[in-house]
């Protein structure tokens, strides 16, 4: 069963780009190395200037749980840049379809 973590980061004014750079670096290095990592989507809100949402996709609950340490480390690194703790939700993925 494929699962996902949806994380919303609310950055302080003027810190969204810096925070994104830090999180994107972590996603591209550390997160990809966790067994069961399937991919991610990063989304800049068009409605809220300081919001970035990340969706990471995992092979199963086991790999999702194994990624928790990397996620916690990433949150810790950007805490000086955010207004509050990120909002995090755990999902079961039913369908993914990206057309080219």
Which residues fall in each region the model found?
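Glycine-rich beta-strand-turn "strand-cap" elements at beta-sheet edges
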Residues: 1-4, 9, 38-53, 76-100
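Short beta-strand-to-loop capping motifs
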Residues: 8-13, 56-60
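Short, surface-exposed ligand-recognition loops at beta-strand->loop->(often short) alpha-helix junctions
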Residues: 10-23
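Residue-level signal for secondary-structure boundary sites
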Residues: 15-17, 62-64, 96
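Residues in and immediately flanking transmembrane alpha helices
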Residues: 21, 52, 72-73
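An amphipathic, aromatic/His-enriched active-site/gating alpha helix that lines ligand/cofactor pockets
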Residues: 25-38, 57-90
